[in-house]
């Protein structure tokens, strides 16, 4: 397919992706606020955190519509979205925000697993314990954000670089060039290793906590009803799928990315979808949460008149 066909496909895709993802995310946020189980406690904070960062991810993705020209050295980053009308440094900054938002939403799912395990163990949450766990799992993100700030300052904000991009984009209409990507600088290499390492490691860490949760609720020391155990199993199943989605989407497109860099092959799918595919979990995650968190699913059934209000079980029963 030619470049024009990819642009036509994305011209249709981005509005649908934005509208559908935003509606489902806002619906989920409403349910988190007003229909969460009483004992969900801080888990709903992490569900909300995941949803908010995925909204940012969707907004940035659709407003930027990046394309990576991997045949150029260094890699040329173009914007075909509304950001093309702004200065290049803003587009480059939004690219870093895109990565951070994806990183944060993925890490939030992992932290939800950790605190779910703590709840199953019936551990009391002290402020120091909560703060310690959150800081521990956010260390890679904090380090990544520091690297991204350094990259923006060094590679986008200097006056001579800004003037260079103003000249390049003076007559740009279809797209603007917003930056250059390379792994030859220390901050960019560190940032790449942090993000790619977390994408690979997070699903397996989540799976580790999944097994511990299931072993715990199936042990003789966990004195709760079969129904309650079943609800926890369903909740954990949904989290597991969410945890593995980034890995499923990232690995193929990143493999193609490295192939294009090493061989200098032009593959238009890779160029146009390199930043689209990693955003797709934001499309699927809210639907998974709406389905696998029982009170949310039942509330949706009530709205669709599939189930009557009187049939809804108390929302206090999901987590404890």
UniProtKB/Swiss-Prot annotation:
Main localization, broad class: membrane
Cell compartments where the protein resides: Membrane
Family stated for the protein in its record: Belongs to the nematode receptor-like protein srd family.
A Pfam family: 7TM_GPCR_Srd
GO cellular component terms attached to this protein's record: membrane
Transmembrane segments: 12-32, 42-62, 95-115, 133-153, 189-209, 243-263, 273-293
Gene: srd-40
Keyword terms, alphabetized: Membrane, Transmembrane, Transmembrane helix
Membrane topology recorded in Swiss-Prot or TrEMBL: Multi-pass membrane protein
InterPro entries cross-referenced by the UniProt entry: 7TM_GPCR_serpentine_rcpt_Srd (IPR019421), Nematode_rcpt-like_delta (IPR050920)
Origin: domain of life: Eukaryota
Protein name: Serpentine receptor class delta-40
């Amino acid at each position: 397919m030619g470049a024009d066909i990819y642009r036509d496909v994305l011209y249709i895709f981005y509005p649908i992706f934005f509208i559908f993802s935003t509606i489902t995310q806002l619906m989920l946020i409403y349910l988190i606020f007003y229909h969460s189980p009483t004992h969900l406690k801080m888990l709903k904070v992490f569900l909300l955190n995941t949803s908010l960062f995925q909204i940012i991810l969707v907004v940035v993705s659709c407003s930027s519509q990046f394309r990576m020209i991997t045949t150029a050295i260094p890699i040329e980053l173009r914007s075909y979205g509304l950001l093309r009308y702004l200065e290049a440094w803003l587009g480059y900054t939004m690219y870093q925000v895109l990565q951070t938002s994806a990183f944060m939403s993925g890490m939030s799912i992992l932290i939800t697993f950790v605190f779910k395990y703590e709840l199953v163990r019936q551990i009391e949450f002290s402020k120091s314990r909560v703060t310690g766990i959150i800081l521990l799992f956010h260390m890679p993100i904090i380090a990544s954000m520091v690297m991204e700030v350094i990259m923006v300052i060094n590679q986008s904000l200097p006056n001579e670089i800004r003037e260079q991009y103003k000249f390049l984009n003076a007559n740009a209409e279809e797209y603007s060039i917003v930056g250059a990507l390379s792994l030859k600088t220390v901050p960019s290499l560190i940032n790449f290793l942090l993000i790619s390492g977390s994408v690979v490691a997070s699903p397996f860490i989540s799976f580790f906590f999944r097994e511990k949760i299931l072993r715990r609720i199936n042990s003789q020391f966990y004195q709760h009803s079969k129904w309650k155990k079943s609800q926890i199993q369903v909740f954990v199943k949904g989290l597991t799928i969410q945890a593995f989605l980034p890995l499923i989407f990232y690995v193929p497109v990143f493999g193609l990315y490295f192939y294009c860099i090493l061989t200098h092959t032009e593959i238009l799918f890779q160029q146009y979808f390199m930043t689209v595919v990693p955003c797709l979990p934001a499309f699927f995650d809210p639907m998974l949460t709406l389905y696998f968190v029982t009170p949310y699913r039942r509330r949706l059934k009530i709205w669709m008149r599939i189930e009557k209000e009187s049939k809804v079980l108390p929302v206090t029963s999901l987590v404890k």
